[in-house]
Structure formats: structure tokens, C-alpha cells
Amino acid sequence: MEISTALMILSAITAYFLWLTFISRCLKGPRVWPILGSLPGLIENCERMHDWISDNLRACSGTYQTCICAIPFLAKKQGLVTVTCDPRNLEHILKNRFDNYPKGPTWQAVFHDLLGQGIFNSDGDTWLFQRKTAALEFTTRTLRQAMARWVNRAIKLRFLPILENARLGSEPIDLQDLLLRLTFDNICGLTFGKDPRTCAPGLPVNTFAVAFDRATEASLQRFILPEILWKFKRWLRLGLEVSLTRSLVQVDNYLSEIITTRKEEMMTQHNNGKHHDDLLSRFIKKKESYSDETLQRVALNFILAGRDTSSVALSWFFWLITQHPAIEDKILREICTVLVETRGDDVALWTDEPLSCEELDRLVFLKAALSETLRLYPSVPEDSKRAVKDDVLPDGTFVPAGSSITYSIYSAGRMKSTWGEDCLEFKPERWISQSDGGRFINHDPFKFVAFNAGPRICLGKDLAYLQMKSIASAVLLRHRLTVVTGHKVEQKMSLTLFMKYGLLVNVHERDLTAIAADLRECKSNVVNDGVGNGVSS
């Protein structure tokens, strides 16, 4: 009996390792270990996860498959993960077969307590209805004007004074933290018309901002942990699950008060002539009757989408230009050239007010530099979907129903096959047409996926560029930034590509005298050439 049992166990082990050998040969990508699948490799490279994924994708021509659970009957379904950055596959997943690749139940369960069935956490008809409603608002000129108004006021009254105080005091400042505060204030103003004033002298603590951060952090931890584990922790009220519950109560109370007050104001606005142009008020005005809970989730979804993305992109942008002074000079000259034409030669007038929308629209090279930043350091480096039905990707990869698919936005911007041999270089010129008068090139959205693509492409893309260009131009005109000596700039491994240790910078005064003199000389030469060419007899 003991011998037969031993033989059965030995046969089972032998059969398992034969199966493991077979499955390992079928899956190209990181090594698959017994039971644990590719998790050991993931854990070993957790501090450089995005680059590790990129390395694997380069070695596998843009697509690989692995399993995170090397157990028969699971490895080719629930445990299988397809990872890709091939533009053909991205177009297939995000556009052509959009309905077959929803966010899926795992993603929705993780963020449900925070985002509910909001636009960024829903699929199907629920998502489509909210998307259509929001799309109508994001295409209006008044929303762009409202965004410009919030951004310019915050830049002038709070952001720039903080930078100036840091310069005068010769004290380093964490630019990433400051940008997070600024964009949080801006998106709150645009979303529900109230300024939490987190970006203010002294950098005050705001209870809503703190509660929102804690709720987001707790939700992200769920994404990392196995579903059964975080649900068990929630049931026992352990760790960040307790913090999530408390934070959500604070967030809900804060937003509930705003919604109640706003509805009362809107009922009397015809009498006092007061007008609200924030997103919350626009949704309240809709013919459809939204519950207060739905309005809260709408607001939270837009805040989550609009805060981190722009601030993270700007942090990497400012770091990159400190490493590339020639590009910084080119951006600055473009800004000054526009201001000479719109405000004249007086340098004092250039810094009197933040740039207008019309002036910002002319900053083609700045937009190119921001786009190049997002190509190399996308705010959301990886995203995932769940396959509803069996499918075959354009490159021939079979994707079984029930399996996960990760599309690497970070890797998509770093492939030689897509961007050329210089794909790892910071080169804004790749976004400028050399044969069409310096026009900005809108690259294929399935090559440049920083704003997503297909039906879920970012609605706030233009507003994001508006905000980033406003902030970047305001800083560059007034200050020169240098990274504090010895400060480490590393990626933080999270759903958003934060800098792990922030971005500590020293703030110096910007001297525009030389640029102004050069521009005046160029202007004078153009005038003289024009006069000379126009003389005839």
C-alpha cells in the first residue's frame, strides 16, 4: 500500500513537471517556476518592474505570455497573462475588439468602494452612458475657459509665490509634491467649483485631500494583493482596510455637503445671476436625474483621473530639461518669441500674467517636449483588461477567455521597432514636422498610448496639455531649476509613475536679458532685410 501510494505521488510529481516543461516551452517570456509561475521574477524585479517588462517585450518582439499560477487547468486561463506593446495588438484590444476586453470584475472590485460605477471603473452600457454625457461637456469652449481660469489663478496667487519664497530663502523644495497640490486644487475647482487650497504658503493640511489620498492608497494596495486576501482583511477590518472605510466617510461627507449646497445655489441662481461652470453643476443641470451618490462618484472619478496624471508628467518634464539645457533654452526662446509678438519687447510684461490660451496654443515645441516626456514616462505605465471570449491578436498570439491582458504603455514608447534606434533619447524634435512649417505631429495613438486610445481615449487630453503648458511656461519664464546634489530620481512602483523620493530642486532667478536682446536683434534684422528687399527704382 505504501509503495503504491509512493508510486502515485511520484507519478503525479513526474506528470506535473512534464506539464510544467511543456507549458514553459509554450510561454515565451520570464521563467515559469513550479506553482508560483513568474511571480519570483516579478518580485525580484519589483524595484524596476516597468523596465523589466520592457526588457522581456524587447526579447519577445513586443508580446509575451506568462502565468502567475503554474497549476494545471488554471495556467492557461485565470493564471495566464498576455503582455504586449505591439501597436497592432493595442489597436485590436483598445478599438477593433473593444467589447471583448473590458476592465473586468477584478479591477472593478478593487476600486468599487472608492469609484463605484463611475466612468473609470465601469464597463458596458453604464460606462457608455457616462462617457457620452461627459464627452458633451469636455468639448465645450466654456470648460476650457474655466480650466484656464482656475489654473492661472492658482499659478499666480499661490504656486509662483511659493517658488519665489524658496528662491529667496535658498531652500530646496519638493517640486513633485508642490505640483500634486497644484493640480489637485485645479481639478477640484474644475470638478465641483471649490478650491481646497492645498497649494498655499505653508502647504497646509486639508482633511478632504488627506482622506482622498488614504482612500486611493488603500485601493491601490488591493490591486497588488490577491483578491481573497484583501477581502479577508476587509472582513477582519485590518490594516489599510480600516483607513479606507474611515477615509471614505470623510470624503463622502465633504462631497455630500458640496452637492447639497450647490443644488440650493442653483435653485436660486436665476434670482442672483450667479453661474456655475464646474462639471458637477453641469451634471446637475442634465435632464437625467442623478442621485447624490452618483454625483459623488462622478466627481471622484474625475479627480482621480485629473490630479496625478498632469503633476507626474510635469515632474518628469522638469527633471528631463534639467538634464538637457539645450532643450530648455529652445523651449524658453519659443515662449519669449510668442510673448514679443503678443506683449511687446518689455520683459516685465512677459511675466506680469500667466500665458493666455491663445499664447499657449502657439507653443508647439513645448507641447512636443511634454509629449516626449509622456512617451518616455507615461503617467500610467501599465494597464490591464480581461478577455471575455477566446481571441487571436494580429501578431498571432492566442488569448483564451478569462485570461488577463496587460498592455505596457511604458514599453510602447521605448521600442526601437516603433520609434527608431534613438527611442530612449529625449528628443522633442520627433514631434515636429520638418517639411510642413514646424507643425506638431499627432503620432498614431496606438504608438503613443499615454492618453489611452480607442473609445476610452482620455476626454481631458486637451485640458491636460493646457494645464501642463500653463505651469511649465510660468516656471521657465521666471525660474531656473536644478536638482539638489545627491538627490535620487527613481521610479516608484505603483499604478501611477511617481518619483519614489520626490523631486528636490533648488530655485534660481531666470535672467531673460540675453534672450530679449537676441530677439530684438533678430526682429531688427528682419525689418532691415524687408526694407532692403523692398527698395527698387
Curated annotation (Swiss-Prot):
The protein's required cofactors: heme
GO biological process: fatty acid metabolic process; lipid biosynthetic process; seed coat development
Tissue specificity statement from the Swiss-Prot or TrEMBL entry: Expressed in leaves, stems, flowers and siliques. Expressed at low levels in roots.
Keyword vocabulary terms for this entry: Heme, Iron, Membrane, Metal-binding, Monooxygenase, Oxidoreductase, Transmembrane, Transmembrane helix
Chain sites annotated for binding heme: C458
Induction and repression of expression: Induced by abscisic acid (ABA) and auxin. Down-regulated by wounding.
InterPro entries in the record: Cyt_P450 (IPR001128), Cyt_P450_CS (IPR017972), Cyt_P450_E_grp-I (IPR002401), Cyt_P450_sf (IPR036396)
Gene Ontology molecular function: alkane 1-monooxygenase activity; heme binding; iron ion binding; oxidoreductase activity, acting on paired donors, with incorporation or reduction of molecular oxygen, reduced flavin or flavoprotein as one donor, and incorporation of one atom of oxygen
One GO cellular component, as annotated: membrane
Subcellular location: Membrane
Knockout mutant characteristics: Organ fusion between rosette leaves and in inflorescences.
Family: Belongs to the cytochrome P450 family.
Function (record text): Catalyzes the omega-hydroxylation of various fatty acids (FA). Acts on saturated and unsaturated fatty acids with chain lengths from C12 to C18. May be involved in the biosynthesis of cutin in the epidermis which prevents post-genital organ fusions. Hydroxylated FAs may be important for trichome differentiation, establishment of apical dominance and senescence.
Name of the protein in question: Cytochrome P450 86A8
Source organism (scientific name): Arabidopsis thaliana
